[in-house]
């Protein structure tokens, strides 16, 4: 069977250095993690690190060959949490979905997972079509929402979508809070389309 690799994915892997030098050479990981004005790292980044450790997931900050995408969904007023992982490795896409319940401690800013369900997922349209659409919406390159010029988020509650991108030489983390409220910005509109695509496919 002939394997067709999307051109967009090939370009991402080349740009990110995923097909780089010998495995004997340790690659320095370029990290992009948003911070607040005082230099403190994003709270959602801290919370995701906590959940990542509890779920015993690989730390993408250490690099991943070839590409892994994680979309963490955080609901502010309920204890539900969700995670979609899409992984491209050895010329093959795979997906996993996690449903979680978590206790939030506002005193020490921690989350403790109390319940977890995990299942393998496959898109209805197939991995080639789904991954092409996902990459065309620039999921690997979207900026952090707070960095979008002219966008002011005055909402205090609501769902936040946190994205981790891991390649052999790059790690990115970015967040979108209620992107459907800011669709006049193409970046937020793309995030809305990404979420719509995932809902339709899974």
Q: Regions from the language model: what does each represent?
A:
Residues 1-29:
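Bacterial Sec-dependent N-terminal signal peptides
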Residues 19-202:
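Function-determining sites in protein domains
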């Amino acid at each position: 069977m002939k394997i067709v690799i999307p051109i967009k994915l090939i370009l991402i892997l080349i740009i990110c250095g995923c097909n780089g030098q010998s495995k004997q050479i340790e690659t320095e990981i370029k990290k992009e993690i948003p911070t607040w004005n005082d230099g403190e790292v994003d709270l959602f980044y801290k919370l995701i690190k906590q959940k990542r450790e509890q779920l015993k997931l690989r730390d993408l900050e250490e690099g991943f060959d070839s590409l892994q995408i994680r979309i963490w969904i955080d609901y502010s007023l309920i204890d539900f949490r969700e995670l979609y992982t899409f992984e491209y490795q050895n010329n093959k896409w795979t997906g996993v979905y996690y449903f979680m319940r978590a206790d939030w401690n506002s005193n020490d800013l921690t989350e403790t997972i109390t319940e977890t369900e995990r299942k393998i997922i496959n898109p209805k349209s197939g991995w080639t079509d789904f991954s092409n659409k996902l990459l065309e919406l620039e999921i690997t390159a979207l900026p952090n929402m707070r960095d979008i010029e002219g966008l002011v988020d005055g909402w205090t509650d609501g769902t936040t979508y946190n994205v981790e991108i891991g390649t052999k030489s790059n790690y990115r983390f970015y967040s979108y809070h209620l992107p459907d409220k800011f669709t006049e910005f193409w970046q937020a509109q793309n995030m809305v389309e990404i979420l719509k695509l995932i809902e339709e496919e899974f």
